[in-house]
C-alpha cells in the first residue's frame, strides 16, 4: 500500500524535539510516517507510538513499517487507531504514563485530498464526506443539508474566514429545498453562484475557504486540538518537548496561546515577588514560529503556510 505524502519541516520538527536514546515518543498524526521514519533512524533505542484516526493510514503503516512493528519482542513502533484527543487513555492501555516528546503535523494529508471518494477536495467530484475518521457518523453531507442558515454562516465565517458566508449559507438553504446537496461539485457550483464575480477572480479557488470550514467543523478539529495539547503537556516528562506544525491561523493561534499559558507564571495581584517554588510548566524553544526554507518552499507547495512551534517541559 502507498501513502504518498511529503512531510513538511521534517528535520526542523524532529531535530527540535531533541530525541534521546531510550526515550518514549508520540507521533500524534502518523499519516504516511515521514516524520516517524526520520525519528526512528535517529533513535538507536526507545520507542514511538503513532496515532492516526484514519484507518487507511494505519493499514498502510502496518505494511510500510513492518520491520519496526515486529522488531523482536519489543517493537520500536506501536500504532493506535484513534484521534489524538485520546492520548492519555490510549497510552495508559500500553502502560505509559509519561513521554519524552510528542509532535503533530496538523491538517489534511495529501492522500486524503487526492482520494476523490473521501470528499475533502473541491478538485474532484465525490459524495460530500470529509471525515478523517470514517467510522464517525457525522459527515459533510449531513452538515450541508441539516444545519440551518445561521449555523452554516457561522461555520463558514468562524473556521474559513469567508467574507461571503451569509450569501453562501443562504444559497445552500435555497438549493437544498428542491433536493439534498450530495456532491462536492454541487457545493462548489453553489458557492460560485453566491460569490460576486469580481471576488471569484482573486484569492485562489472560490470554494477553498468554505471547504476548509466544513472540514474543521465535521472533524471538530479545533476542539480536539485544544484537548490534545492539554493532555500532551501533562504527559511530558521534565525535559520532554512538544513540536506542532500548523497550516492555518486558527490552529496556530490555539498552539501559541496554549504554549504562552504554560510558559508564564500567573502572579497574584499585589505580590511584588514571585514566590519560591512557583515556576512555569513550559519553556518556549522558539519565540517565533519556524517556517520552511527557500529550498523546501520551492519543492513542496504545502509548506508555504506551515508554522512550527516547539516548547519544553520544565
From Swiss-Prot:
It is found in: Cytoplasm. The keyword Signal does not apply. Its EC number is 2.1.1.199. One of its GO terms (cellular component) is cytoplasm. Keywords: Cytoplasm, Methyltransferase, rRNA processing, S-adenosyl-L-methionine, Transferase. The keyword Acyltransferase does not apply. SUPFAM superfamilies: Putative methyltransferase TM0872, insert domain, S-adenosyl-L-methionine-dependent methyltransferases. InterPro entries: RsmH, SAM-dep_MeTrfase_MraW_recog, SAM-dependent_MTases_sf. It comes from the Bacteria. GO terms for molecular function: rRNA (cytosine-N4-)-methyltransferase activity. Its main location: cytoplasm. S-adenosyl-L-methionine binds at residues 33-35, 52, 84, 105, 112. It is an enzyme of class 2 (transferase). One of its GO terms (biological process) is rRNA base methylation. It catalyses: cytidine(1402) in 16S rRNA + S-adenosyl-L-methionine = N(4)-methylcytidine(1402) in 16S rRNA + S-adenosyl-L-homocysteine + H(+). Belongs to the methyltransferase superfamily. RsmH family. Specifically methylates the N4 position of cytidine in position 1402 (C1402) of 16S rRNA. NCBIfam families: 16S rRNA (cytosine(1402)-N(4))-methyltransferase RsmH (TIGR00006). This is Ribosomal RNA small subunit methyltransferase H. The gene is rsmH.
